[in-house]
Amino acid sequence: MTQNIHQHRILILDFGSQYTQLVARRVRELGVYCELWAWDVTEAQIRGFNPNGIILSGGPESTTEFGSPRAPEYVFNAGVPVLGVCYGMQTMAMQLGGHVEGSNEREFGYAQVEVKTDSALVRDIQDALSATGAPLLDVWMSHGDKVTAIPEGFETVASTDTCPFAIMANEEKRFYGVQFHPEVTHTRQGQRMLERFVRDICQCEALWTPAKIIDDAVTRIREQVGNDQVILGLSGGVDSSVTAMLLHRAIGDRLTCVFVDNGLLRLNEADQVLEMFGDHFGLNIVHVAAEDRFLGELAGENDPEAKRKIIGRVFVEVFDEEASKQTDVKWLAQGTIYPDVIESAASATGKAHVIKSHHNVGGLPKEMKLGLVEPLKELFKDEVRKIGLELGLPYNMLYRHPFPGPGLGVRVLGEVKKEYCDLLRRADAIFIEELHKADLYNKVSQAFTVFLPVRSVGVMGDGRKYDWVVSLRAVETIDFMTAHWAHLPYDFLGRVSNRIINEVDGISRVVYDVSGKPPATIEWE
């Protein structure tokens, strides 16, 4: 019988910080299961989850404003350790009888806090020593309000010149508050502090490991589907690929993968997917060549959001047609991951705005009447990749740069035509090949080529001709929420440009996108 990898668990209450998912990922990296819930949960929900500890996230609100989010009172009566981060510390302080005020100056960026009192949270953790021998910690602050009086039973553990209560603690109740963000890498000892809280103070064992997650997923898949047949849409992306490998391990030949070649994939990608999963791993794959159908539906359409919806709709139609040909299929597998679940929950409660329609969640054909199998729905992307490695998938496939669900459909600006896709595929392949050769591919977060539907004059031999323009795009980012354009070497860009213009007949000009996010998005459409 497999071990219960969910036995030890942390509950993270989300107050709206851009870093909240990062807190959850850091806890998972410690080998401990956690879930991320909205701050306004009920006592019954918390009791049902039965956490070993609770973390209150940061957030953009002010605890001094009427109606600002508060932690459920039960959090402080549950008898488990609680860690408040930034806003989480402020609401803890205010709700337990302390005081919070708006600060004259917002503290944002690097700070050094001085530890004044021994605490289980930071004992023997330091970056340096002060002139008086006190431990110093390099941390990342991002707050306007600050705690000006701590609740009864708490001690001041650490402070800065402008923040008198950078860390507070009630050791008896195991309540801790930090005014900085331990989850970001700028807080150099942040992961050690989280480890101290999760592993030592909450006494959680490291049960959440790739090998154990695989064993648990295989067991749960077998329990869920029994001897039934399962169908999966395999795209060759990370999520569907790892889903396919997990299901194949669990049920073998009772999995059928439908691979839809929509004509919007990268150069030779369809052949690579079929060779890897069909020939090498031995999965049952139904290959559907649907380029003409997709491009036919996209003809004449220039609007990016409309293109996304057409691509999503046609995929569902094609997949549904193929699924109906499979006899005795009872289950549909999807590569939904935990951030998809969080995002969908936020949309359902009206707490999120749709920037671009999501291509994964919500694409289930209602008329199919199949049960849903989602073996990755508890996992973050980095966990999915680690599991993929454990299952034998190649590193270079799992750690490829992100590729949008609609594929080249949103990298060809305006109307999508086969001619444009073919030119873009070849240009993009040259860019990616040169990034690898120059050892730059893994130094940028995402790189790709965009086809611009404008003609530009060029000189070839003794003649002039008007051909198409492509733009190279490369960005550096930690979380894809913000991004800087990558400062690639000029000689490298020149080499890529020369190769594209000389080797791809039909392209006469190559430009480089130097827009950051914000104001631009990473993808052009």
Swiss-Prot record:
Coiled-coil region(s): none
InterPro entries from the UniProt entry: Class_I_gatase-like, GATASE, GMP_synth_C, GMP_synth_GATase, GMP_synthase, GMPS_ATP_PPase_dom, NAD/GMP_synthase, Rossmann-like_a/b/a_fold
Keywords from the named record: ATP-binding, Glutamine amidotransferase, GMP biosynthesis, Ligase, Nucleotide-binding, Purine biosynthesis
Binding positions (ATP): 235-241
GO molecular function: ATP binding; GMP synthase activity
GMPS ATP-PPase domain: residues covered: 208-400
Keyword ATP-binding: yes
Pfam families in alphabetical order: GATase (PF00117), GMP_synt_C (PF00958), NAD_synthase (PF02540)
CC annotations in GO: cytosol
Residue stretches making up the Glutamine amidotransferase type-1 domain: 9-207
Catalytic activity: XMP + L-glutamine + ATP + H2O = GMP + L-glutamate + AMP + diphosphate + 2 H(+)
Documented EC number(s): 6.3.5.2
Subunit structure of this chain's protein: Homodimer.
Function: Catalyzes the synthesis of GMP from XMP.
Official protein name in the record: GMP synthase [glutamine-hydrolyzing]
Organism: Pectobacterium carotovorum subsp. carotovorum (strain PC1)
